[in-house]
Amino acid sequence: LYGDRGTGKSTSIKAVANRFWPDGLRVIQVYRHQMKMLSRIISAIRTRNYRFIIYMDDLSFEDFETEYKYLKAVIEGGLESKAENILIYATSNRRHLIKETWDDRNDMEHTQDMHRSDTMEEKLSLVNRFGVTISYTKPTPKEFMEIVITLARKQGIAMSDEDLKKEANKWELSHGGLSGRTAQQFINYLLGKE
């Protein structure tokens, strides 16, 4: 799941976990510094009577970091068969997970990398192994206002739609722009004023 900040990527994972918890779904959050342990984690849970999501939040790598290679090997590499009860989910603000530079794409310039296309393939190979990519985009101004009004009504805030829109517009300009997170923070602010 990738896209703009505050658009609900992590919230979607939590919603899936809550929805399917009664059916035996469990979530294990793995942090970047724990990538080396992925094989051990999978070995420990692959025969359990639950279904698992191994979840990595806000995953991205700088071009000099190599931890992503452990993740690549686990997703579709190695000799061990894929576990039927385990899925790997990641959220990121970066579409390709690994930082790209203009040098990566410019085949005309001379750099230290003799085979630049190999470098690009290496960087893209991680995201391609996930199989499914879901994009989260910022809401339009109209959608943002609909989110604000819906949240306000759920919380019993008695402001008129017109006043809500006016105040929400001021709020988003100084608090991170159009996103579901910004809408929720605005509602929390209004609730705190009551």
Put a short name on every predicted segment.
Residues 109-124, 131-143:
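Conserved AAA+ ATPase "SRH/arginine-finger" region at the nucleotide-binding site
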Residues 137-194:
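C-terminal alpha-helical "lid" subdomain
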Residues 33-59, 69-80, 115-122:
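Conserved alpha-helical scaffold flanking the Walker A/P-loop in AAA+ ATPase domains
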Residues 1-28, 41-47:
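Walker A/P-loop
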